[in-house]
Every structure is written in structure tokens, then in C-alpha cells.
Amino acid sequence: LHKAIRRQRQMCIRDSINADVPKIIPAYNRIRAFEDTCKEHHVPYELNLNVCGDSYQELFSQMKIIFADIDEKYPGQKKGVFLANDTYANMFLNLIFQKYGCLPDTYELVGFDNSPIASEAILPITTIGQQIDVIAHTSMELLVQQMEERKKRKPVPLAEPIHKQITPILIRRETTN
């Protein structure tokens, strides 16, 4: 995210689209990182945390409203939209194509997770990828540490879960310059 925003300082990042998650959940850090990075680089931003639903149709209906709002509020302006996951980014991209028939120069989209839909979309979507190999390796190290601790004569169990942050990577595709 830092790379994407630093690279596009003149670009007006208008929205982070996500569900409103409790601050104690690690996924909240995506929202916090978005805000912190925009503030650090003096980039105006808005958060839209109203996305929730139990079906694709419900989510798509909400995404239509969000897209219409952004499109109406900022005509002719550059709009960078960071979405909570690649599925949301694909929905948003579809809405743009339904209205314009292409991805106008005034829009740039970034998804999150590097899921298959990001590369399979009508235009491959720029995304923030999690380093699954590093996550798996780190998880295994933590598991082995806990197993070794349990072998001790007087094992000391963890007082609370260990949270490790693994640096994600920006995967540039066709929805950003």
C-alpha cells in the first residue's frame, strides 16, 4: 500500500472499501494502514466501511451504491480505490465497465489477497499479495516452538496468541498505471 500511494502521490485516493471490522481483529490493520499511509503522504481519502452481506447479490447491490456515489462526487477527478479484497475489486471493476465500457484514466483500482479472480478479471487487477510461503514458514516455526515447549518437564503454555506481521507485496497489473 505504501508503494502504491507513494507512486501515485498526485492521485487522489478517494476510498477504502471494506467491512467495518472490530479494531481487535488483525484484518483491521488493513484499514489502519490505509489511513496512516494516506495521512503520511498528505493524500485526501475517505473510508467506506458499509460493505456487508450474506450473498454476492447483497454485496454487489451495496457496491453499486458506493460506485455511483464516488462517480457522482468526483467527476473528471482521478480516483484511486483500494478495496478490502479482490472479489470486491472485481465487482467494482465490473461496475466501471458496465457504465464506461472500459477503465477510464480517472480510475485506478487495487484489491487485496492476490486471489485468482484478480488475474482472471476482465482486466487483471493490481493487488496486495500476501506472501503465503512466508506465512506458512512462520506458522510452522511457531508450531515447532510450541511443540518443543510441551516436551519440557515443566512446560509454560503461551499466555496469549502470538501475532506476526508479514510484509505484503504490491502486484502491479492493469488497473493501475
What do the predicted segments below correspond to?
Residues 68-177:
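Flexible loop/turn connectors
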Residues 1, 64-67:
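Short hydrophobic/charged patches on amphipathic alpha-helices used for structural packing
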